[in-house]
Regions:
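Aromatic-enriched alpha-helical transmembrane segments of multi-pass intramembrane proteins
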Residues: 16, 70, 115-219
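Active-site alpha-helix of zinc metalloproteases
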Residues: 25-26, 75, 148-149
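Functionally critical transmembrane alpha-helices in membrane proteins and complexes, commonly lining
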Residues: 10-66, 82-92, 207-208, 213-214
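Transmembrane alpha-helical segments and their boundary/interface "anchor" motifs
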Residues: 45-48, 52, 64-125, 156, ...
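Aromatic-anchored segments of alpha-helical transmembrane domains
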Residues: 24-31, 97-100, 178-191
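Membrane-interface helix termini and inter-helical loops of multi-pass transporters
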Residues: 37-40, 104-109, 191-199
Length: 219
């Protein structure tokens, strides 16, 4: 069987199916974490790494041939913005609405109103929260936690189009190897591969996303 299913309008059926399975895994992992039953799905966070790989696969297949044929970096960024930002905005605003509702019903259960609003505005712009609180901890995106992975994916997209899109395979292999070594170090240091969602592990997410994304590009 081919590694990809039948292709329709450059969409791979098999990858779309795996994308859906991974999304469900991430959702179940977050639900399990909230219910303190994460032991039932201890490695569900690895679905995020699959998304990083998938992003590299899709972007390389969809855009590599277009550079030099009328598409430049600005056009690429605009296309990605149109593709991704509606989801960012919807998630951040929905999370903000939930926190505001909690504030109205039980103010003590959420942060002060000013901090809730600041977090909502920053997260809606895909900007990590620069400080935390006793209630939200050190989360980068307290209004919509999963946005952290999209933030790092966007960074990978920008780095790829600015630095790597026209580079040959040997250089990409070097980048992959360096990222793998750094990622392995971070896993050993933190005792887990589940890094990147808070300020304590912010920099550890960089080799994590780089390894997955570049691996996808090479595929």
């Amino acid at each position: 069987l081919p590694i990809y299913g039948s292709m329709t309008a450059h969409r791979y059926d098999t990858l779309d199916t795996l994308r859906g399975v991974a999304a469900v895994m991430v959702m179940l992992f977050h639900l399990a974490s909230r219910q303190k039953t994460e032991h039932l799905l201890p490695h569900g966070y690895l679905a995020v790494d699959f998304f990083f790989i998938l992003s590299g696969v899709v972007l390389a297949h969809a855009y590599e041939g277009r550079f030099g044929q009328g598409l430049d970096g600005r056009g690429f960024v605009l296309r990605r913005l149109i593709r991704l930002y509606p989801l960012v905005l919807a998630g951040a605003l929905l999370g903000l609405a939930v926190r505001l509702a909690k504030y109205l019903v039980e103010p003590a259960s959420v942060d002060p109103l000013a901090q809730v609003l600041v977090a909502g505005l920053l997260n809606a712009a895909l900007v990590p929260m620069p400080y935390g609180s006793e209630l939200t901890g050190r989360a980068l995106f307290p209004t919509d936690g999963p946005l952290w992975s999209l933030f790092f994916e966007v960074l990978a997209n920008l780095a790829w189009v600015a630095l790597l899109v026209r580079r040959k395979t040997p250089l990409l292999l070097v980048v992959l190897l360096v990222a793998a070594l750094l990622d392995a170090y971070c896993i050993r240091h933190y005792g887990t591969a589940n890094v990147g969602s808070d300020r304590d592990t912010f920099f550890a997410a960089l080799p994590r996303v780089t390894y997955g994304f570049v691996a996808g590009v090479l595929l």
